């Protein structure tokens, strides 16, 4: 029986999908591989199911690099994530595939890029797109190979996946569903002044009298702990635990605020005029959103409270991660359990003149990604580019499962085996069709749908303040660029997708389109003069 491990292939440009790679094999080998596949899975002789490791996947919503293992904020206190990192491997150059919940999570769970599904906005749910309704998701892939699968909290966006699809006798996304993600306790009225864009109910932060046990994430962690404590041992399990915080509204109890006294609070590196060297296109991708601009936060004296609230929520959710880790460590299966922790995207706290996500800079794209468990080196870091897209093939490989030809990620197993091993393919993040950010170890290239671009030397400019392509029409004045800079642009450009699917049917919420006569936000043409910074 043939077993093809996609981890053994070279780092191809991103437009070379697994299917395209497979089609490049000799015909007899390709036909044999496809003939022995089931549900798009390339199968082979498999080890005894019971010997396979358990997987606990912990997802945290809107968590940027403000965690101790990444050092994004000098004050942050995340002892549980620090403990996990000390037990395993932290990818310090990991990036999401979309700076928005639904497309990012869809990409991770299906192994396909937004450009390959047309999922760019908060809708639709992938199963409602006829072309992709039968995609095998990550939990389903494990279920097909003998795993018990459980999902609690926010793994898919909103309530996606929880309802039985038409024609199904049962919900086929996983075996067991836990509680949905929720804010939990809320104050009787908003704690901050009315915000622009309709005073959205989620735009709020601060503390009010309530208990940690009243929060939605506490309930999700309690469910996860109960599942681990009572887990049968007849088969391995794949447990997905998704936490809501630090997504807005950023509410936490007073004890978490006490960790960050206002008088000693370190503010993020916010540079006045930081958007002076970025094109108008950089504004279009977050054109009209409920998240306040930095100017509003400063005028209403809300920037410091937001930063403090975000940090407090990060520390609270870290404590819930700690509860799950404690349950794993006291479990009789602790030595055979792999833990992976990730966030769907980052979050701006005033940097680049905005709060929220929906950008292609480090604040939105860089995410925590930590692996720990059997076969994973302890206390190590890897600065090679990594993508959330890579989790599907990586976890499959670590569990001894065969690959799935639908996936476009590349396994991180070579870097887990050797954290210094070079990885040719950079990380790409997409926000609506045509807008991409591409990162390797040194450079970040951003190209917008109208061809306008930005380039940052992340080695000398880690906060991405200095756009090296300022006032340089893209490739029309190549001679103005240094040789090294031009070569970096050339190298990264080859990873732009050759084709991009248009918006999937039912797409809505935070949708930007480039049409012949300009950019359109939510079907309304953008007028540059309307820019509010």
Question: Where do the model's predicted regions map?
Answer:
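Formylglycine-dependent sulfatase
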Residues: 30, 39-448, 453, 462-494, ...
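Short, charged, surface-exposed hinge/linker loops at domain edges
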Residues: 505-520
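Hydrophobic alpha-helical transmembrane segments of integral membrane proteins
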Residues: 22-23, 364
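N-terminal secretory signal peptides that target proteins for export/translocation
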Residues: 1-20
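Bacterial N-terminal signal peptides
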Residues: 23-37
């Amino acid at each position: 029986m043939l077993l093809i491990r996609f981890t053994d292939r070279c780092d191809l440009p991103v437009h070379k999908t697994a299917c395209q790679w497979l089609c490049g094999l000799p015909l007899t080998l390709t036909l044999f591989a496809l003939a022995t596949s089931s549900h798009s899975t390339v199968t082979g002789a498999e080890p005894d199911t019971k010997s396979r490791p358990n997987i606990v996947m912990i997802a945290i919503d809107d968590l940027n690099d403000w965690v101790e293992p990444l050092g994004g904020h000098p004050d942050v206190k995340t002892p549980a994530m620090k403990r996990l990192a000390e037990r395993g491997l932290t990818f310090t150059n990991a990036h999401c595939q979309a700076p928005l919940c639904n497309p990012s999570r869809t990409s991770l769970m299906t192994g396909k890029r937004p450009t390959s599904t047309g999922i760019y906005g908060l809708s639709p749910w992938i199963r409602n797109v006829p072309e992709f309704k039968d995609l095998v998701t990550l939990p389903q892939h494990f279920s097909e190979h003998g795993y018990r699968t459980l999902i609690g909290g926010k793994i898919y966006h909103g309530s996606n996946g929880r309802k039985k699809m038409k024609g199904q006798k049962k919900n086929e996304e996983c075996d067991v569903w836990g509680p949905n993600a929720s804010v939990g306790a809320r104050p009787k009225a908003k704690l901050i002044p009315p915000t622009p864009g309709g005073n959205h109910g989620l735009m709020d932060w601060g503390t009010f009298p309530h208990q940690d046990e009243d929060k939605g994430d506490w309930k999700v962690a309690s469910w996860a702990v109960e599942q681990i404590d009572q887990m049968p041992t007849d088969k391995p399990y794949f447990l997905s635990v998704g936490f809501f915080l630090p997504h807005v509204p950023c509410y936490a109890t007073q004890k978490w605020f006490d960790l960050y006294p206002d008088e000693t609070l370190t503010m993020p590196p916010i540079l006045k005029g930081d958007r002076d060297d970025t094109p108008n296109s950089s504004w279009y991708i977050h054109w009209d959103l409920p998240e306040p601009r930095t100017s509003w936060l400063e005028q209403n004296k809300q920037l410091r409270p937001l930063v403090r609230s975000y940090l407090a929520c990060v520390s609270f959710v870290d404590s819930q991660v700690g509860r799950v880790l404690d349950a794993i460590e006291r479990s009789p299966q602790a030595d055979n359990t792999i833990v992976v922790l990730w966030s769907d995207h980052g979050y701006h706290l005033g940097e680049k003149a905005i709060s929220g996500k929906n950008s292609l800079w480090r604040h939105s794209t860089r995410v925590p990604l930590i692996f720990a468990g059997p076969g994973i080196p302890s206390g190590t870091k890897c600065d090679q580019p990594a993508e959330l897209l890579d989790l599907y093939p990586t976890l499959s490989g670590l569990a001894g499962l065969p690959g799935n030809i639908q996936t476009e990620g590349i396994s991180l197993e070579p870097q887990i085996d050797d954290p210094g091993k070079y990885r040719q393919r950079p990380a790409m993040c997409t926000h609506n069709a045509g807008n991409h950010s591409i990162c390797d170890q040194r450079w970040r290239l951003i190209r917008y749908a109208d061809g306008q671009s930005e380039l940052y030397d992340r080695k000398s400019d880690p906060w991405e303040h200095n756009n090296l392509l300022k006032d340089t029409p893209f490739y029309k004045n190549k001679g103005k660029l240094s040789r090294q800079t031009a070569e970096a642009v050339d190298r990264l450009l080859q990873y732009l997708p050759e084709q991009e699917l248009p918006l999937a049917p039912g797409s809505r919420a935070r949708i930007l389109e480039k049409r012949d006569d300009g950019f359109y936000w939510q079907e309304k043409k953008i007028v540059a003069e309307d820019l509010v910074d």
